[in-house]
Amino acid sequence: MSRARGALCRACLALAAALAALLLLPLPLPRAPAPARTPAPAPRAPPSRPAAPSLRPDDVFIAVKTTRKNHGPRLRLLLRTWISRARQQTFIFTDGDDPELELQGGDRVINTNCSAVRTRQALCCKMSVEYDKFIESGRKWFCHVDDDNYVNARSLLHLLSSFSPSQDVYLGRPSLDHPIEATERVQGGRTVTTVKFWFATGGAGFCLSRGLALKMSPWASLGSFMSTAEQVRLPDDCTVGYIVEGLLGARLLHSPLFHSHLENLQRLPPDTLLQQVTLSHGGPENPHNVVNVAGGFSLHQDPTRFKSIHCLLYPDTDWCPRQKQGAPTSR
């Protein structure tokens, strides 16, 4: 009996020890709820760039190259047509005094005192003066045209607005389908090297940004242009291309919107004429090379077709025929 009690007591003690051990074990803590996921912040849009300042007409310097003998037949037409709508932009560079022209153009008629003979030296002399006057003006764009060009000032402004004047921009139309070569010479005539480059023909017009024009200064300013042209024996428009491409490594941007008398102007689609930047005509030597446009003037009344183009662009001009103006169509 005593043995049975002893065994029972031992069993009770063992059970009590086991219960005590269980009570001493750490109880598991309740798991904290997972934090709710917050959506990642949406990426910030880049700050909007301020709109580029719009180009104003007086940001552009249009240089018209002419000669004394053309003041009557050619310049009178330009003054009556496109220059009348772009007076603040246009500067006329000639080679002789003309009180009547100066009365119309004021200080925007510049006598270059260059020779009136059409030689390489005379052409480069005028371009040199054009360049210096542009730099002096502080304007953003330089555009050169001849006195047989019609300039659509609105199309020109629209085209230039696509570019920054601080970048290297040389816009125009080459008259050749390949680059030309120039042989660089040093004093004494020793050949140095041959350079290939494109150039925009002056007869169609071309434009330079101020940023690029300033880089041209060592070879173009204060008479240096004439020295550079003489070094490579090239005329004015070719020398511009030589400086830009051959010396500075910039590139001509070919534009189909510039036109000279060297191309077949009758092939221009009539419905695109009012979008072109410059137009031209064949002159007395090639009177049939004109744009194909209908208007209130016959070919006899308007042999260059400049008046017809002008009245389509500016039908409010007081001398334009008082009729309904439509899109350009073939004659």
UniProtKB/Swiss-Prot annotation:
Membrane-traversing stretches: 7-29
Q: Which UniProt keywords apply?
A: Developmental protein, Differentiation, Disulfide bond, Glycoprotein, Glycosyltransferase, Golgi apparatus, Manganese, Membrane, Metal-binding, Neurogenesis, Signal-anchor, Transferase, Transmembrane, Transmembrane helix
Q: Which residues lie on this side of the membrane: Lumenal?
A: 30-331
GO terms for biological process? animal organ morphogenesis; cell differentiation; nervous system development; pattern specification process; positive regulation of Notch signaling pathway; regulation of Notch signaling pathway
Q: So which domain of life are we looking at?
A: Eukaryota
According to its UniProt record, this protein's enzyme class is transferase
Which coenzymes or cofactors are required? Mn(2+)
Which residues make up the binding site for substrate?
R74, D147
Name the Enzyme Commission number(s) assigned to this protein.
2.4.1.222
| Disulfide cross-links | C114-C125, C143-C207, C311-C320
Q: Name one GO molecular function term.
A: O-fucosylpeptide 3-beta-N-acetylglucosaminyltransferase activity
Q: Which positions are catalytic residues?
A: D237
So what does this one do?
Answer: Glycosyltransferase that initiates the elongation of O-linked fucose residues attached to EGF-like repeats in the extracellular domain of Notch molecules. Modulates NOTCH1 activity by modifying O-fucose residues at specific EGF-like domains resulting in enhancement of NOTCH1 activation by DLL1 and JAG1. May be involved in limb formation and in neurogenesis.
Family to which the UniProt record says this protein belongs: Belongs to the glycosyltransferase 31 family.
What is the protein's given name? Answer: Beta-1,3-N-acetylglucosaminyltransferase radical fringe
UniProt gene name: RFNG
